[in-house]
Amino acid sequence: GVNYAALNKENGDRKCFIPRNDFLFELDIGAYHPTLLGKLVDYDFDSGDIHMAFSEMYGVDYQKAKELTFKQMYGGVFEQYKELEFFKKMTVYTDDLWARFQNEGSIECPISKHIYKKEYLEDMKPQKLLNYVLQNLETAMNVCILWEIFKILKGKNTKLVLYTFDSFLLDVDENEKKVIEEILKVFKNKKLQIKYNYGSTYDFR
């Protein structure tokens, strides 16, 4: 089978995919995991671009900031950044999560209410547990987003044709452009940053 999520964006592999309606419209959630972690630890990013906010915190360029953030989210905070407010809150949250997991034998995830039980999880560590909760939150949030999108598209020619983690691809009817505005509001109401592409092929070029 074809892994559509892994199609190369640069070499034209995507160009053969065309809409049944009039054009394709792709929404990508920016800095999804840092955003969700911010919600968990009650940290509000002032910047419109979260990776830019981290870039300013670290004093490094944009791409390096993305790399540093993900390394610390999944592998633990580096010594030189432990005093940054975001990571201080992340550390407090992780420690509290771990304490509850150890003392009560389980933790409940937000939104999904899924319960991770200590007795079923071997070789668990504080950072790993945080990652479990974060990825569960991503899935739960996406289910909520998809539900809202499906309600908007009910009875419409416009369809959601592909969903991959933080990306949503629509096949849009030219006469139903208003649904795009409604769908964008779904992401805005959840305070998620969005980038989008559109075009006559999946290549968007």
Set out the residue ranges of the language-model regions.
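Helical (often loop-to-helix) elements that flank the catalytic cores of nucleotide-handling enzymes
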Residues: 175-193
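Conserved catalytic core of nucleic-acid polymerases
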Residues: 53-163, 190-194, 198-200, 204-205
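Short beta-strand-to-loop capping motifs
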Residues: 170-174
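Acidic, glycine-rich two-metal-ion catalytic cores of nucleic acid-processing enzymes
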Residues: 1-60, 110, 114-150, 159-169, ...
